[in-house]
Every structure is written in C-alpha cells, then in structure tokens.
Amino acid sequence: MWRLNISADELNGSAEVRPPNGNVPAQLYVRLAYLNIPPSSVPDVERLLTEQPSSIPTLDIVVNELTLRGKKLGRLEIDAVNRVGTNAVREWRLNKFNVTLPEATLTANGNWAAEGPRVRRTQLNFVLAIRDSGDLLTRLGTPGAIRYGEGRLEGQVSWQGSPITLHYASMSGKMNLAIEKGQFLKTEPGAARLLGVLNLQALPRRLTLDFSDLFSDGFAFDFVRGDVRIDQGVAFTNNLQMKGVVAGALIEGSADLVRETQKLKVVVVPEINAGTAALYVATINPLIGLTSYLAQMVLSKPLVRAGTSEFQVDGTWADPRVTKVD
C-alpha cells in the first residue's frame, strides 16, 4: 500500500492505493478537503478513467468541497468498481454517486460503459431531493428564476460521455417532477431559459388578455408535478400540472434541450373555482395524457371548458411565440 498527502491550489487531502485482500480487489481510496476541476482539466480526468481501467479496479472517493467548471457543488461521494459487465463490455459500475448541497441531495447509482471503440455512455438511476429550488438554480447558474420550492426529481437518464459531463444531444431517459410551495419570479425574456415559459407572466405580456393581476410578479404555485420523457435531447411531457392559490396551468408538448426551442400546448386556468378545481384533484396519468384528460373532464364537468383558455407556445426559449387557440 502506498499513501500520498496532497496540498495544492486545486486539491487538498490524501490518496491511498490498497492492494487486493481476499475477495476485495485493489482500491484507490481518496479523501479530499477540496477539489477544483476547471473546464480545461475535465478532459484529462475523463481520459484517465477511460484509458487506465485495469490499473484502477475500484474507487472509494469522498470530496468535501467539489468545484466543477467554476460551480461549487458541495460534497461528492463515489463508490465505483471497474469490471467486465454484461455482453463482455468493460464498465465502471457506480454503486454510489452522491452529491450533497445545502439546497438539495442527489443520490444516484448506475454505470459508465463502453458503447463502441471510442464511445462510453453514462446511465444513472437518481433521486434529487430538493430543499430549495431557487437557491439550487442560483448555485447552478440560473439566479432569480424561482423562489423557494421543495420536492423531488427522480428517474433514469443516460448520455454519451462521463458522469461529470452532460451531453444533451445524446440524452435519453424518463423522470418524475414534484415541487411544492414556490414561486416563478418575474424575469426578463430569456433570462431563465425554459423556466421563462413556465412563468405565466409571458402570457399577459404577449397577449391582450389581462391576466396581469395574477402573474405580474411571477407565478406562486402550490405545486408543479408531472412526468418527462427525454429522447436524444428532446424532452416530452403530456401531464405537467401547475397549481397556484387562484390560478393554474396544464402543459403538454416538447422542448429541444440542444436548440433551446419548444412546442407546447398550455391550458391556463385563470381562476380555480368549483368548476375548474377538478382539474387538479388527481395526477394526470401519462398513459392518458392532457388532451384525453381534458376531454373527459369537459364531458363530465362542462364548466371546465368555460373556465380555461388554451395557447400554443413555440419558438425559442429566449423569445417564445404565444398564440391563443380559439
């Protein structure tokens, strides 16, 4: 066994290489107080893990303060085994890939496996427990989009590349979102990217309908919930529900994560009353979808149609185009 103590601007801590012991393979054991990986160093880290798999059989890594590409991402814990998986393909089996922040905790596992001679793909099963959506987005580079908001985002997602480099064009998966007690804040067009579409202030700004008393300061919500499917960088939903104290919206459609465009159907409920409250009693089954759900509601509760307005939202995230559907 050898041990190395490290103290530098980029990292501080210790590393050990532990030899095999019975059924326990050799292990790289790392404990760091901090680790800073600037953008220029990310390819080097990925190259090390890709080109030297047999010499690093297992990883046990804890970093108390991780900074990746200039973003402070809190505590990182990795437990990974390099092995030959199914179909005789060598992979990093990620038994633990956890990130802990004051605003949220990511708990994940999965693998990073070769798809071909030069391509490796990350696959993660994850739960993101969110304590403050607004502060989390601020940390990740989107300030002033949301205030508060607690809940969960969980599912499965995969992409070409390493666990530390998201590649939207190859991303696929599915996830469920459930956030409560927050507020989409009033922002300039494009400042919050796709979140700007969910902030219903975009509707009165672009249309003659006067919803300004409801949405002028941003949309305060009791909950935002729904399912999202991602296929090669395009996200789809057919059951997204947003409910506020006096108003709400139902959304289905798609958003291109690479081109930053969308094509959405938005049904606005400017007043939640005895007629429209039924729209939010139950979660919309993704097998049914918003269109069928609304059709059933209109048949059973005719007041629902009278209490809603429908819009098409397309164009770019920075400049969405909103059209009322008569």
Set out the residue ranges of the language-model regions:
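Short, compositionally biased segments
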Residues: 85-86
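Small-residue helix/turn framework positions
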Residues: 3-46, 51-72, 77-79, 89-314
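Gram-negative outer-membrane assembly/targeting C-terminal domains
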Residues: 308, 312-326
